[in-house]
């Protein structure tokens, strides 16, 4: 192995490090400690990702289903409403359209960011240092994929140490990531776990027993009326009483109407109980940091390894990062409407919201997103330069005003000293 370095050259490799967290499902809660609320995965991955699954694939709905423009919340709500009728058919339809990162029927969100390329050709080991409350808080992962999955209830800082292969002859790289379990978006975090209840109808006052019996008799009469309407004629028994047909028909119509009105409040709770509950939103929190590991003047053998394993280039536009480009386009339309002030609702959410650990939202991992980030940094640099120039001008004006004030004070002191000398003819003692 050659110990020579390639002089005057640097090579870099993009990586993603961060975490993905989801609330525990009822099945996962059985195996987790009672106080744990979330399942999270911390990992070091390649920046390139497979296309994210479409919203229709995640929800199990048909490809023609429509959701709220630019919102993943609509897809999740559709998933909660369509998961119960036929889970087998929904799973079959989803498996045909979802990518390999979501190949499981439950759509494992923990595999949906990065990890398209195998990075074990230049990373030998990744060490994760968890909170001390976990058993064996220092975890070493010696093979691809480099990730740790655990459950917990709190957020804490995780130390990530990356060890490179022997050919690199480089020291380990230490990174820090703050585990994120709860969303940054306040409008999404405020969504309740249950659907909004309809306004409660005004309940009538309790009826006396006589009215209850009248209601029961009206229901029976209504049943007799419907039977006679179908053409079935009932014969009166020997103990039956003859009633005026005109009066009986009027009474039947009135009592049947009352029964329908009184039965309306009773039917509403039945409909409300059959409606499936919506899950807590959002079900996934992506907190990832894009970074590039730079190797200045690498070893010749290591440079050959990196050259023979080039990283997969990122998509040109953000829409190509999703399996359903229409979902991203609808988000852009909703975002443009919100910027113009046409929308009065909450700000639109990308189909798969990704955040940096600082809470900054970016749409996808693409060259378009990189250019947008570069433009944002350039605008911030220009704004900082403008503020610096403005502050410099204010400082120059303040220094000039201070100099003028000092000159004025000195002139006043000299004038006062001259007047005192002229009056007394002696110099006043220095104070």
Curated annotation (Swiss-Prot):
Protein name as annotated: Protein AF-9 homolog
Pfam families xrefs: YEATS
PANTHER family: YEATS DOMAIN
Composition-biased stretches (Pro residues): 195-209
Top-level taxon of the source organism: Eukaryota
Cellular localisation: Cytoplasm; Nucleus
Keyword annotations: Activator, Chromatin regulator, Coiled coil, Cytoplasm, DNA damage, DNA repair, Nucleus, Transcription, Transcription regulation
Assembly: Component of the SWR1 chromatin-remodeling complex and of the NuA4 histone acetyltransferase complex.
Domain YEATS, chain residue ranges per copy: 5-309
GO biological process, one term: DNA repair
PROSITE patterns recorded: YEATS
Predominant localisation class: cytoplasm
Basic and acidic residues composition bias: residue spans: 101-113
Keyword Nucleus listed: yes
Annotated function: Component of the SWR1 complex which mediates the ATP-dependent exchange of histone H2A for the H2A variant HZT1 leading to transcriptional regulation of selected genes by chromatin remodeling. Component of the NuA4 histone acetyltransferase complex which is involved in transcriptional activation of selected genes principally by acetylation of nucleosomal histones H4 and H2A. The NuA4 complex is also involved in DNA repair. Yaf9 may also be required for viability in conditions in which the structural integrity of the spindle is compromised.
Compositionally biased region (Polar residues): 213-233
Family to which this protein belongs: Belongs to the YAF9 family.
Coiled coil: 383-419
Domain notes for this protein: The coiled-coil domain is required for assembly into the NuA4 complex.
